[in-house]
Amino acid sequence: GMSVMVLPGRNPVVLAKELATMDLLSDGRVEIGLGAGWMISDYEQLGIPYDAPGVRIDRFLEGLGIIKQCMQPGAFSQHGTHYNVTGYDGLPKPVQAKVPVLIGGGGKRVLSIAAREADIVGINPSMHAGVVGPEAFAHMTEAAVDEKVAIVRAGAGDRLADIEMNIRAFLVNVTDDGAGARSRLAGMLSVDEAMLLSSPFALIGSPAELTERLLERRERWGFSYVIVGAEDVDKFAPVV
């Protein structure tokens, strides 16, 4: 299924009803992945204005509050800049008393929100340009991830131990020729080969090498929840 839904592109009340219904049908297996959205094409395809980052994040924060309230017993009202809800008692209610929320982000404000509000925090590259390009690779380095994780740790306070850290590996190749694969990919992407070895967004190497790397990254950054794309699932099975 999808990892993170772009909340500003959805009505939060309708989305909450859909998610609660899925939780009922799956007997409590739903995990809510939400983000403010960064890809311009997502907004263009849906016919939604691609507002400034601050506006998109404000809308996201309001919508997040509504979804959380919908999942709780009783009616509620919430009146904000982007949404107005009056006396709403959303039904159905989910099976889980607290449906886990995953919030993914790459910038300071969204990561700070995630640290306060999420059960699972997804660390992403910064995508201020609105498209995948050189800027994204610059924010995939281990130094950039150090900074992002530090924001989460500072913002989480005493709830840090209850947060699960998540990352998506965008560059995956399970191969016994890890050095050769990294060299070829570095040339294609015009990036430093060493970055492809150290970046937690990349998993390129043999099953044994990748297992060791995943353990190192869990120790350093706390990443215990790692996502690979559907296209990589079968070849990643030996690592699991």
Predicted regions, residues:
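Active-site-adjacent structural elements that line small-molecule/cofactor binding pockets in enzymes
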Residues: 1-240
